[in-house]
Amino acid sequence: MPSTSMIEDRGEIERRRFEYLDHPADIQLHSWGTTIERAFEACLVSMFGYMTDLEKVEEQYEFYWKVSGDSMDGLLFQFLDEALNSFHAEPCFVAKRVEIMRFDKEKLEIEFRGWGESFDTSKHETEADIKSPTYSNMQIIEKSDRCDVYVIVDI
């Protein structure tokens, strides 16, 4: 199966709830869901999917995180950055699936977990190295039946 970053089939893109948009120097992640929680989850999975083929990632163990922010954009940044730090440092965790267990919009806190495994160069291919999410052109668009999230990541 082609990597997530190469999928162009609209049906498959809709099923996954994310796509990659061209950007002059980096890449823009666009994710969506029926709620802000589902859109954030899809955004995080899309970030991992841009770095490696998630079809080759097994759900071997769970990893837990808790983050807070000073704004909704800051919360999204911390959400992505904390998970990315778990990929860049031991145990080099890559999540195939993510679930937000608690999303407090007033306190700007998220507790979440991911299912995946440690990145293994003998099993997983590196497709891109994401250094960090950015605030550049970050957008969270909430409507009554859908939330869209746009994040440019530094590669």
Swiss-Prot record:
User: What GO biological process terms does the UniProt entry carry, in alphabetical order?
Assistant: tRNA splicing, via endonucleolytic cleavage and ligation
Q: Name one GO molecular function term.
A: metal ion binding
Q: Which GO terms describe its cellular component?
A: tRNA-splicing ligase complex
Claim: Ribonucleoprotein is one of the keywords in the record: no
Q: Which residues bind Ca(2+)?
A: D26, D154, I155
Q: Which Pfam families match?
A: Archease
* Transmembrane residue ranges: none
Q: Keywords of this protein's UniProt record, alphabetized?
A: Calcium, Metal-binding, tRNA processing
Query: What Gene3D superfamilies does the database record attribute to this sequence?
Result: Archease domain (3.55.10.10)
Q: Which InterPro entries match?
A: Archease, Archease_dom, Archease_dom_sf
- What's this protein's function? Component of the tRNA-splicing ligase complex required to facilitate the enzymatic turnover of catalytic subunit RtcB.
The record's listing under PANTHER family reads: ARCHEASE (PTHR12682), PROTEIN ARCHEASE (PTHR12682:SF11)
The entry assigns this protein to a family as follows: Belongs to the archease family.
Give the protein's recorded name.
Protein archease-like
